[in-house]
Amino acid sequence: MRRVDDFRLRFGKRELVPIVIGGMGVDISNADLAVEVARLGGIGHISDAMVQTVSDRRYDTNFVKQKLKKYKANVASSDKSGVHFSLGEIEEAMRHHVGRTMEAKRGEGMIFVNCMEKLTMNAPRDTLRTRLTAALDAGIDGITLSAGLHLNSFGLIEDHPRFRDAKLGIIVSSPRALAMFLRKNARLQRLPDFVVVEGPLAGGHLGFGMDWAQYDLATIVAEVIAYLKSEHLDIPVIAAGGIFTGSDATGFLEQGAAAVQVATRFTVTQECGLPDKVKQEYFRASEEDIEVNTLSPTGYPMRMLKGSPGIGSGIRPNCEAYGYLLDANGRCAYIDAYNLEVERHPGAKKVKVMDKTCLCTHMRNFDIWTCGHYTYRLKDTTHRLDDGSYQLLSAEQVFQDYQFSTEGKIAVPAAAVAVA
């Protein structure tokens, strides 16, 4: 019986274990996790979501404090059009985040950074160019373009000396989205090095409408592979979303995928950036505790735990400190939803905002618990301890279970021994 380790992801002469850990922000798929996955021979991701916040937390910088200080007089205003990021500070934060991660890298694997187009930051084109360029400057192995069509993203970095050297790929949820990307970038004569096909069971933002349940990953992967074949294009396809066991992964590799991208099972590893108390919430979750909603100001549906503390929280918008989802006109759907509730409840000290959430603040504080569809199965991958909590796993344990397991089985690690 075949297993994941019987396959290899090939980039030219380079061969890797065909396991990619998806990019999860804010700092959930963190440097520690990415470095460990690279050591094991796969591809780890870091995320550039709220990179200045991540830099402050990990590297003792003070970008957020300085931005808030600069725009503090604007805090009470609903008009955020004048609140801008310093491109120089974005670049510096990216160099910290990417550079330090790459310095720590060991082993034969690779480390990519996940870049969301929907992080519009009140200057979509300039801030995205800065993030992409800084990542390349800092030595990242590859970039995965996510949360958007990215029709112009290659063009932003076409003059960079590493444009044809670094591995560049895109996440799509349909052959149509891929076709649009390829047509738009045909003039550059630079194909993506890989395509991640993300299905409807993925965690966080989804590339589907609220009819997501009508789609399935296997069908979309087959359609994308067929499309590439019809266009005589040899681009590795990476299947993602709802791949919970090594046998699940092997099925996609046998179907023709070059690799799989997984994430949910790594959220409860010791290396993952989530606080341990949140990891326990993931373990405890039942299938009924998980929902897909429209709370994200990005406009994309989002999968999360219903018990996320950020749901319904009516905090004042924190755009002066954060503001990563401000569009090109300084607007954000949460600001509108918040202002509407304030108007409805004049004089109230607190309001509840149920339509949208202040994603920047709550993701920074780990109060929106984004998750994959199969999060409710995590409790079956480990042991419950005497105190009722669940034993955390190591990234190596989870990675190697994907790599070597067969017959739909999950190798539960040995129970931890209590220290007297």
List where the protein language model places each region.
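A structural signal for short, well-ordered beta-strand segments and their strand-loop junctions
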Residues: 45, 144, 238-239, 261
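Short, surface-exposed recognition loops or helix-turn segments adjacent to catalytic cores
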Residues: 153, 239-240
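Conserved active-site-proximal phosphate/metal-binding subdomains
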Residues: 20, 202-217, 221, 225-238, ...
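Active-site entrance/lid segments in N-terminal catalytic domains of soluble metabolic enzymes
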Residues: 1-231, 400-419
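Residue-level detector of alpha-helix initiation sites
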Residues: 28, 243-244
